Every structure is written in C-alpha cells, then in structure tokens.
C-alpha cells in the first residue's frame, strides 16, 4: 500500500519513518523498492537496531536507512517533515497474547507483541505522535490485528480529527490487517 501511495502521490524523495523497526524488514524493503527514499528506522531495542543495520548492509541500502534508538517518533525533531510513518506496532491484547503458542510468547520480547489490555496502547500514542511529524497529506500506515480491532483503530483515527481517507486493507489471512490514513492540512 505504501509503494502504491508513493507512486500515485508522486513523492520524488519520500521521507519515511518505520516505528518499531525490529529486524528492519519494512524499512529495508521500502529503501530497496523506492531508490530515492530515505528511511529512518526507530526502535527502543539496541539489539533490534543492530539486526536492522546488518540487514540494511546485506541488501545494500544502509546509506539510505538511518537507525535511531528511541520511543516511537521521539527521534524525529522536525515537525511536519515526514511523508510516511509506517509501523508494525505491538497490537496484541492481553487475551490474544495469552493464547499464543509458547514458542512465540517465549521467543519474542513481550513489549514487541502486546499493546496493553485492548492491544491499542501503542497505536493510540502513534496516532497522536504522527500528527506532529507528518507533512500535510502525509500517510500513516500500521499493521493491526484485524477484525474488530480494525474498526476500533479506524474510529480512533476519525476521532483524532486530523486524518482523512482512513482505509482498512486485508492481508492474505484476514480483513482489516493494515490501516492507512492521510493527515489533513494544518489549520494554523
């Protein structure tokens, strides 16, 4: 969805932030597919950032994938300077977290998976923080659990009042697994 958005909106040099970059899969793929893009990958985990760095080196995009340790969008200091914020944030609710197979629960850091009782603690913060960094017309794209959570996230974006074109997209397994929204122009 992000690649199509860049093409239809003719963004010549996309400035992208991948929040919760983890291994760098999204950041590295976007840099590889969009040769003029500059991607900032943010994570609170130093270990994750090291893995992302290795993956960017391996795929030859390290010069356009910058990495920063921080909480959500805190490393982005300039307001309205980003074209796209992408994230696969922690979105599992407590019940779903408890039902995961033990090998998943025990392998992945809990903070990378669970977003609190309803799974949306990080998503709520990311919606609010994105308003500060996205340029007018910029795109927010997040992976979510789908199902009822998709409708809830769409409602959160609408309630924020700064987003338009809120759309839920399916993945191969379920509807509503990715949500995209464009930020409205500022009214200042």
Please describe what each predicted stretch is.
Residues 1-99, 147:
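Conserved SAM/SAH cofactor-binding pocket of Class I
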Residues 30, 104, 126-130:
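Class I S-adenosylmethionine-dependent transferase superfamily signal
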Residues 88, 107, 143:
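Alpha/beta-hydrolase-fold catalytic nucleophile elbow
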Residues 91-122:
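Mobile active-site "lid"/loop adjacent to the S-adenosyl-L-methionine
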Residues 117-183:
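Conserved Class I SAM-dependent methyltransferase catalytic core
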Residues 184-188:
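Flexible, glycine-/basic-rich loop-and-beta segments that form/coincide
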